[in-house]
A protein has these predicted regions:
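Conserved N-terminal catalytic core of the sugar/cofactor nucleotidyltransferase
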Residues: 2-6, 14-16, 20, 28, ...
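Conserved alpha/beta core of the MobA/IspD/sugar-nucleotide pyrophosphorylase nucleotidyltransferase superfamily
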Residues: 4, 177-262
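Short acidic/His/Gly/Ser-rich catalytic and metal-binding motifs that mark active-site loops
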Residues: 11-17, 194-197
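A structural signal for short hydrophobic beta-strand segments in well-ordered beta-sheet cores
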Residues: 26, 155-157, 231
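Short, high-confidence coil segments that cap the C-terminus of an alpha-helix
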Residues: 46-47, 103, 130-131, 226-227
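Alpha-helical elements of Rossmann-like donor-binding domains used by nucleotide-donor carbohydrate transfer enzymes
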Residues: 92-93, 121-122, 217-218, 249
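The conserved acidic donor/metal-binding loop of glycosyltransferases
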Residues: 110-114
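Conserved core of the sugar-phosphate nucleotidyltransferase
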Residues: 116-201
Length: 262
């Protein structure tokens, strides 16, 4: 069994400004909500999903009432008093409240993406390699990389695909198709390890971006302690839905492909 922790406490202000009426995880993309697409990326029998939500959303937004039935094994964590400090803070709060298993292999998965991959094979290889962490990456041509302004979490890796450094809103290659881009899926050997290094990150305000702590940057502290962080380029098909522009671009490309296949 693994646990997949999905922080979904945000307000999604850019989507609200763009006229969307559902919070980001519940926006429909080709007939399914974003959160349903994410759940479909994992083996249902061997995965417990831990959804971190704001208590205000659980009370006032009917979309959240669907969460208990979205997967076979579900835990919903309610966060009361909330500050916008990013997914790392949400994870740490859930851990301190005893909602994150200390010993299980743990993935923190962002709530605005989809990829085609084999999650079971990925977990098995992480266990076989006995890595402390792993960041599945995508390389090559992906439409979300075309706009010059679109930069994400970029991984600098050695010849064996182990992490040397990760930076947010950055590309280690001028040609972005050559860089290793994080897919927003973050593996840790255990919940305890994820918490320890998340807590380390939050001790350093200079490691926040606009006041938020990103899970990606936790791994620089693992590297600093000589931990093994594997960055396989095993994501061949990736969908980025983080902003209204990302979603519009995705829909445009899907319509182009549908037209080409007629």
């Amino acid at each position: 069994m693994i646990q997949v922790v999905i922080p979904m406490t945000g307000y999604g202000s850019r989507f609200v400004k763009a006229g969307y009426t559902h919070l980001k995880p519940f926006i429909k993309v080709f007939g399914k909500t974003m959160i349903e697409w994410i759940v479909s990326m994992y083996d249902q029998d061997s995965t417990e999903f831990v959804f971190i939500c704001r208590s205000a959303h659980l009370v006032s937004d009917k979309d959240f009432q669907k969460l208990p039935f979205i997967a076979k094994h579900v835990k919903i964590v309610s966060i009361g008093w909330w500050l916008k400090l990013g997914p790392v803070n949400d994870f740490c709060r859930a851990y301190k409240e005893g909602e994150i298993d200390k010993s299980l292999p743990t993935i923190v998965n962002y709530c605005d993406l989809f990829c085609l991959w084999n999650s079971r094979s990925f977990i098995e290889e992480c266990l076989d390699r006995d890595v402390d962490g792993s960041i599945p990456c995508y390389t090559g041509f992906h439409p979300n990389l075309i706009p010059k302004k679109n930069v994400y979490a970029s991984c600098k890796v050695n010849s064996d695909q182990y992490l040397e450094e990760i930076k947010e809103k950055f590309s280690f290659e001028e040609d972005k198709t050559l860089a290793h881009h994080s897919a927003g899926i973050y593996y840790f050997k255990s919940g305890e390890m994820a918490y320890h290094y998340s807590n380390e990150l939050m001790k350093h305000d200079n490691d926040s971006l606009n006041g938020e702590f990103y899970t990606s940057l936790v791994y620089n502290y693992l590297v600093k302690d000589s931990k093994k962080v594997w960055c396989p380029d095993n994501i061949k098909f990736y969908c980025q839905w983080g902003t209204p522009e990302d979603l519009e671009d995705f829909n445009m490309w899907m319509n182009v492909l549908k037209g080409a296949c007629k």
